[in-house]
């Protein structure tokens, strides 16, 4: 019997950690695809009135929205740190990913694929904002293998899902060579079987996706 149902779509940055944790904990998840909030059915809007993803519905009918909450519910104690400070730091980096990196990255990427209006000035600003936030991660990871503590935590899996699109479409070899702390961390965490099983092998950009209107 499934642990529950996860409403999401392929390559959704907010869902990778949820899927990886479920895989690691042998929690079978039924996946239902929601391609866009514009296509959300009335049934789905009853679960999540904003029509956003992901949304989790447990086998017992328990409904949970917001990716951080779902990831925490899905997780086990081994991924949540060993002290109160580590737990707080894990939440900190998850929040940093979802509130700081993802909106900036979306402002860079979405106009290039027609998902948002194309305004070059705004896109360049979003690019600068994204790279500044990734620099914070790169600096933090100096001398560290993981974001929090000495072992893998939920923060690593969650932030990996947030930044994988940047590595796939924008962060070319030159950038990766100049930011080895973050790049090495990305390669290390993405190589984990629980990640590869749900996301496939990493795809690394050969060149930065150009800022030009979508064709």
From Swiss-Prot:
Recorded metabolic or biological pathway in which this protein acts: Mycotoxin biosynthesis; sterigmatocystin biosynthesis
Family matches, as Gene3D superfamilies: 1.20.1050.10, Glutaredoxin
Record's keyword annotation contains Transferase: yes
Top enzyme class: transferase
Binding-site residues for glutathione, renumbered to this chain: 52, 66
InterPro entries tied to this protein: EF-GSTs, Glutathione-S-Trfase_C-like, Glutathione-S-Trfase_C_sf, Glutathione_S-Trfase, Glutathione_S-Trfase_N, GST_C, Thioredoxin-like_sf
Cofactor(s) needed: glutathione
Residues where substrate binds: 52
GO biological process, one term: sterigmatocystin biosynthetic process
Record domain GST C-terminal: where: 83-211
One CC-aspect GO term: cytoplasm
Pfam families documented for this protein: GST_C, GST_N
UniProt keywords, alphabetically: Transferase
EC number: 2.5.1.-
Induction section of the entry: The genes forming the sterigmatocystin biosynthesis cluster are co-regulated and induced on oatmeal porridge or the fungal isolates were grown either on oatmeal porridge or in YEC medium (0.2% yeast extract, 5.0% corn steep liquor). Expression is positively regulated by the cluster-specific transcription factor aflR that binds the palindromic sequence 5'-TCG(N5)CGA-3'found in the promoter.
Domain spans labelled GST N-terminal: 2-82
GO molecular function, one term: transferase activity
UniProt-listed PANTHER family: ELONGATION FACTOR 1-GAMMA (PTHR43986:SF1)
Similarity comment text for this entry: Belongs to the GST superfamily.
Function: Glutathione S-transferase; part of the gene cluster that mediates the biosynthesis of sterigmatocystin (ST), a polyketide-derived furanocoumarin which is part of the most toxic and carcinogenic compounds among the known mycotoxins. The first step in the biosynthesis of sterigmatocystin is the production of hexanoate by the fatty acid synthase (FAS) units stcJ and stcK. The polyketide backbone is assembled by the non-reducing polyketide synthase stcA by condensation of the starter hexanoyl-CoA and 7 malonyl-CoA extender units followed by cyclization and release of norsolorinic acid.
The protein, known as: Glutathione S-transferase stcT
């Amino acid at each position: 019997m499934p642990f529950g149902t996860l409403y999401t779509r392929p390559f959704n940055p907010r869902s990778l950690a949820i899927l990886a944790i479920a895989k690691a904990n042998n929690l079978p998840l039924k996946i239902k695809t929601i391609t866009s909030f514009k296509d959300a059915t009335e049934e789905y809007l009853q679960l999540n009135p904003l029509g956003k993803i992901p949304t989790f519905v447990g086998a017992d009918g328990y409904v949970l929205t917001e990716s951080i909450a779902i990831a925490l519910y899905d997780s086990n104690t081994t991924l949540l740190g060993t002290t109160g400070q580590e737990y707080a730091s894990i939440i900190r980096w998850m929040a940093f990913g979802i509130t700081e990196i993802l909106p900036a990255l979306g402002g860079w990427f979405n106009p290039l694929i027609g998902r948002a209006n194309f305004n070059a000035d705004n896109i360049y600003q979003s690019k600068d904002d994204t790279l500044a936030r990734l620099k914070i991660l790169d600096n933090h990871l100096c001398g560290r293998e993981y974001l929090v503590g000495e072992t893998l935590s939920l923060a690593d899996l969650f932030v990996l899902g947030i930044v994988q699109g940047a590595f796939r479409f924008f962060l070319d070899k030159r950038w990766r060579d100049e930011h080895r702390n973050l790049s090495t961390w990305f390669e290390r965490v993405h190589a984990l079987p629980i990640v590869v099983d749900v996301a496939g092998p990493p795809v690394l950009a050969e060149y930065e996706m150009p800022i030009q209107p979508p064709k």
